[in-house]
From Swiss-Prot:
Binding residue positions for ATP: 730
Compartments (UniProt record): Cytoplasm
Record-given protein name: Leucine--tRNA ligase
Species, as recorded: Corynebacterium efficiens (strain DSM 44549 / YS-314 / AJ 12310 / JCM 11189 / NBRC 100395)
Keyword Ligase: yes
Gene name per UniProt: leuS
GO molecular function, one term: ATP binding
EC number: 6.1.1.4
CC annotations in GO: cytosol
HAMAP family assigned: Leu_tRNA_synth_B
Amino acid sequence: MTNPSEGTSSSAQSLAYRYTPELANAIEREWQNYWTDKGTFNAPNPVGDLAPEDGRELPGDKLFVQDMFPYPSGAGLHVGHPLGYIATDVFARYNRMLGKNVLHTLGYDAFGLPAEQYAIQTGTHPRTTTMANIENMKRQLGALGLGHDPRRAVASTDPEFYKWTQWIFLQIFNSWFDEEQQKARPISELIPLLESGEIPTRDGADYNGLDRVAKQKAIDEFRLVYRSNSTVNWCPGLGTVLANEEVTADGRSERGNFPVFRKNLSQWMMRITAYSDRLIDDLELLDWPEKVKSMQRNWIGRSRGAEVDFTAEGETITVFTTRPDTLFGATYMVLAPEHELVDVLVSRGTGSYDGVDPRWTNGQATPAEAVAAYRASIAAKSDLERQENKDKTGVFLGVHATNPVNGEQIPVFIADYVLTGYGTGAIMAVPAHDDRDYEFATVFGLPIVEVVAGGNIAEAAYTASGESINSANDQGLDINGLAMVDAVARTIEWLEEKQLGRGTIQYKLRDWLFARQRYWGEPFPVVYDEDGVAYALPESMLPVELPEVEDYKPVSFDPEDADSEPSPPLAKAREWVEVELDLGDGVKKYTRDTNVMPQWAGSSWYQLRYIDPTNDDQFCNLENEAYWTGPRPDVHGPNDPGGVDLYVGGVEHAVLHLLYSRFWHKVLYDLGYVTSKEPYRRLYNQGYIQAFAYTDSRGVYVPAEEVEEKDGKFFYQGEEVTQEYGKMGKSLKNAVAPDDICNNYGADTLRVYEMSMGPLDTSRPWATKDVVGAQRFLQRLWRLIVDENTGEVLTRDEALTDEDNKHLHRTIAGVRDDYANLRVNTVVAKLIEYVNYLTKTYPDTIPTGAVLPLVVMVSPVAPHIAEELWKKLGHTDTVTYEPFPTFEEKWLTDDEVELPVQINGKVRSRITVAADASQEQIIEVALADEKIALQIEGKNLIKQIVIPGRMVNLVVK
């Protein structure tokens, strides 16, 4: 390989030889151009366009490092954004030096609400703003010297990318989940099972007796993607429905802060719940932070318990409970206001509130009026708000249900703290042993019956375990005196014997709402015939591209108008919507689906496209996937699930993105498209760079860089302002652009500073004034090797002293361990210590053997200066693939050690002894020391304590 300035008059050479920001910028530009021109970071694939042209075999040792898909924001990057990108680059560079084939690249997650909202604010088409944002982000990241393989970069908005997003959607759409095999299978394998009757239809109808439309509907009920007329979060202000995860605790949209209402709509759903057990159980296979695993377990919310059948007005009301042992304490029932039986029960009940406790009626005359008014009052509440609401409200339905264990008639209510999304949407209320039920019973004057011993129910619900009491009937059930586990088991056994219930498992996880009424997203590869039957488009018709439209804004409504209906922007593009297609039985008229996929779609599989980005025939060749992400039991153990070797990003994606991508990946695994069971083998959550922000007396943020500090107070344009600490961002007026730091100090200085600020997984405060410390370290490194006046190299051929070798090999050993474990802050500390030692020891010229390994060790964290120094030391190849230095054990231990000697706990002298000296020898040397001998003369030596390698303590009187 050649070097950037070889054979030319380099701009860097025309500058002064001192390592100034100007020289740093020139060096960085040249080496960045060199890396691009030479394809330095291009990682070869086993097969396909990215395979080695010379046919050489790839290293068996590989590493796939990945950053979380960034949004190309219109605001650009601030210095907090590159923290994770720099860390993964350091890790990737280090591993290249270990001889590994390293895949590291970066793409852009550009569909979805953030990009669309920004485009609407600026009045520019989202495609235009997105492309401009991507180019700006490429420029900003490129200036940091990140070692990405540019051939593998993708954007979720590129039709050649979302063609495969649509293709994967179709694979999921054309699959069903086989409960017996616990895996996805093609729909084509379901149809013969329906025809033979081996698997019944969901409603029990004879499949062979159904007409074409009915057969299609019967099949659709098994699909992993289906349309459901269900309760969704409708946001009129945004003109779209939102997933639960996109709604704040106070019932507003996360983006835009608009009111959100619960509404019944027909929407695309993905049957992620079919994978609940695998999504929980396979967490044990992953090298992820326990905090993230716990968040996913809690989100899925697996609970073991029983379904119990209560009866009311000829209807069966099934409840799910984890505590069937408390059935004898159930004194009322509560249904979710949206429960399908509410209106049926009201119509069959008394129809009147005559003689009913006024607390149960909510001020209404009839149950029907009360239900209607109550539903209206809670329409704007989110699920989270309903669950957290301390004020218990509800209304009586005018009916009673029969408790199956004792025959008691108990009143039936609706209340907002019961949700349709968990369990069965109905609960048996046991106020003596559940806090929320206790609060409700207290407000409504309902009976509280103790059935678990150990508490004082006159004061509060008793929710701990204890022996069952007051729990027996004359039908063969008596659990009095049993502990909880045994009481639960016996109750379930009795319920099953009497066919009044059954043991079961329930989950909090709901199916994934997979449609948005927006413009800027992936179109669905689905059309509908005149009967409304959905048809998946064949692969030959992909991608279904977004039409170019003039009016791409969503049809939004009065934010408070809960009765409004979604009207997707794509519905306006009639020429695109209404099509004539031949789907195998002649040309017919169809209409396209006018919803788009949610912003999570592209990020649910993008790591696989990084592997094979130029493949026109497959989303990812299986041989390439197996090489980069396939299981490696010989390296990672027999239960290795495979996946990306290191995935770095913020903990805010712990549930949504990671859960969705795991679901998609498992479907692809079941269908044989990937060899890895999981998308990400190891996950690392980096911390955040935070900063001070300042507000004036009106609470308005002022530019942080213009604030002055005087006597512990802060002033902006002469007015005192208030300091606060937290996020960095444009709206807070405290964002620092990486462009400015690179221009004023150099990219290597920014990299070193961000990596030295503290452990990668913790948050840390940004302070521009401290950046100079990183710059001075690099300047000292430069001066070790380069004469600032002449530009001459200051090295000489000379053997290292024993002291040199000790410092060098200890630095190598420490740095290797720290790089391998992402402790880059301590890498920088060790390199600074070694540079300081060399600076002090060699003020003029320096042995080449002392600095060659130093340059290699510096190169992952400060690659540009390392490349330049490597060149000056006589090398013609890039330092990128130079083998990382190794250490010799003999230099890691001392022949002699110095130990402090204490007398009665106070240090009185220091002694030098052989590193392997016995305790007797150490005491002998200590007692012979002149200072110690004087201190203990004439005193009694009571005790002699030796802590090997650390100290000696003599106790005297």
